[in-house]
């Protein structure tokens, strides 16, 4: 009986250690809905409504590949800036970027994407996107070398326009798009 309990506890701990999440932080008073688009054949994630100046944490399935975008309350559901992810990809890495390819004119949606461990750091080294677009840390063209990698699996995604603007132009470690797609 005791062995079974220990085995169950170990399995639960392993599950927690490999959990993926994105915390969406709404930086202004506008309510937003975040929509998820999985790659073909992967699990759909329900959309989430985030009140103005609030946040919501969303659990992401193991090895999930896809994107998320936000739509401001009252606006048409049109994809804008995309938060793109490959969780637990090649080499156990999570690949991520903010993509302006679909709609570079979206100034109110996804802004920045970075590991949760960098939330309190002044200068973020693993970041994609920016507070004011255009910037050099967003993905603008197919095969752009703007994808960032990390072993971390918990992320922060900022939405909307912060009340204080801080420009972050930090050199980040980038990898070619083929690794994100698993095409070596």
Predicted feature residues:
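Fungal secretory targeting signals
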Residues: 1-21, 180-184
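Extracellular low-complexity, O-glycosylation-prone Ser/Thr/Pro/Gly-rich "stalks"
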Residues: 22-48, 56-65, 70-184
């Amino acid at each position: 009986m005791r062995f079974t309990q220990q085995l169950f506890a170990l399995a639960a701990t392993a599950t927690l250690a490999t959990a993926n999440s994105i915390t969406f932080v709404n930086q202004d008073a506008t309510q937003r809905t975040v929509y998820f688009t999985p790659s073909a054949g992967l699990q759909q994630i329900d959309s989430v409504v985030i009140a103005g100046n609030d946040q919501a944490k969303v659990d992401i399935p193991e090895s999930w590949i896809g994107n998320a975008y936000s739509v401001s309350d009252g606006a048409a559901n049109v994809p804008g800036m995309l938060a793109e992810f490959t969780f637990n990809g090649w080499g156990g890495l999570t690949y991520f970027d903010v993509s302006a390819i679909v709609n570079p004119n979206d100034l109110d949606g996804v802004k920045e994407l970075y590991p949760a461990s960098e939330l309190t750091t002044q200068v973020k080294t693993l970041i994609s996107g920016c507070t004011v677009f255009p910037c050099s840390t967003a993905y603008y063209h197919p095969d752009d070398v703007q994808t960032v990698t990390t072993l971390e699996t918990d992320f922060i995604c900022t939405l909307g326009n912060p009340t204080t603007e801080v420009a972050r132009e930090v050199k980040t470690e980038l990898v070619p798009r083929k690794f994100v797609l698993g095409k070596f």
